[in-house]
Amino acid sequence: MKIVWSPQAADDLVENNKYIARENPDAAIAIVNNIYESRKRIREFPAQGRVVPEINQQDIREIFCGSYRIIYQIEAKRILILTIRHMKQKLTKDNL
């Protein structure tokens, strides 16, 4: 399945990276690399992620990558990464 990043998810990745890089550039690089590596798990086993409890829709799932939640939607021909949130950040439908 093809993986597509929503504009929101791409912005989240950039903003999270900038925030972390201010204090620890090496950690920022490692987190981005780990998030990109997580795409392989999502692509190979999209249903493996758990249903996002705040949304409670079967097609919207998440996997964890360190302290981050990668939230994605399983569609017929692609997987859409909706957002990347730190575990401490509140998630609402408006964030998707």
Where are these regions (language model features)?
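Enriched for short, Lys/Arg-rich terminal
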Residues: 65-68, 73-96
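Basic, Lys/Arg-enriched alpha-helical interface segments
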Residues: 2-59
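Basic/aromatic recognition patch in beta-strand/loop cores that engages polyanionic ligands
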Residues: 47-77
